[in-house]
Amino acid sequence: MEEKPRLIDSFLFRAALIFVLLLPVLLRRDLTPTNEMKYLEIADEALRDGHFWCLFHNGEMYADKPPLYIWIVMLFRRLLGCHCAFLLELFSLVPAIVTLWVLERWCSEELSSRWRAAASLSLMTCAWFLGSAIVLRMDMLMTMFITLSLWTFWKMYTGRATPADRWLFPLYVFLAIFSKGPVGIMIPLLCIPVFLLFERRFRFMGTVWGWRSWLLLAALCGIWWFFVWREGGSEYLNNLLFHQTAGRAVNAFHHKEPVYYYCYTVWYAMAPWSLIAIPVAFLPLFKRVEASPMVRFLLAVAASFFVIMSLVSGKIAVYLLPIFGPLCFASCILLQRMEDGGSRTAVILRRIMLWGSLLILAAAFVIGLFFPGWLNSLL
């Protein structure tokens, strides 16, 4: 017997609900001095000194991040004459909602509306995902572009891509790089071939990473690096390309952690839904449930990126943000297959994920409305 559709099953309703419940948090919290205020200061310094491609903080080079997010801060500073934290926070919240929409649209052929609701709300309320959706950082922007690139790859892989998708794929990859740096290319370049190897279709790499992808990526990066060199000279370009990439990967000068760091941080970074998503992700290994090609791809991306980032010297929990979506949605597809097979446990878990997520969002509303000081201490 089919269940009647509910209001919560509508993506537009869920998106509006997320926005309304997080609105007090967005309006009443204070900006953090270590990261958020620093980005505003970098934007002010760039506007004052006429820098556009090269970033500086208190006169010192700040090649840690590409300029895209700072450009957004600069744009609103120029338009409004002051910084508006609420508008800037939307450039984290809106990409988070777009990421949910992409994953729901992508997985709609394997997930019912009820399971899509559970998957997207549980992803939204993962600790680090929710936190990244309300702070002034570029991580969610990068996650959105990575998710778009993965969806575009899947359309190419399954023969559903339009001619434009062959150009959109490298464009999304570039925008991910331009948002956060080299971590933006790691999933499309390193994790996709892992999946293709397991599927014995490695030759498809020539279609995904063919001449169009490399041409557009080289052209856009070349333009960026040329203007960086023109404005900041060889020293800034060297800092951007080598010190901030190879230095962080091999012998990090910031956030250096042991190789097993993510083995324990992933549990609280995805909390509370790591307790469901991660164990369920291992079920196909034990033949408890069959994994479709889509699930295999999502899990291959999550597993390979986890291993790759564990081998990188510099580690922060938020670096795992791009794999939260694949993990949550893959686990929900597996749970729905179990429910279709008569599993009562899967039904219970779906309800826990749905109502637990709504409870977390309601708690965020109350805290933002009545206890903003406590929220500031958390961030």
Each language-model region and where it sits:
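Transmembrane helical bundles and short interhelical boundary loops of multi-pass, membrane-embedded
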Residues: V347-L379
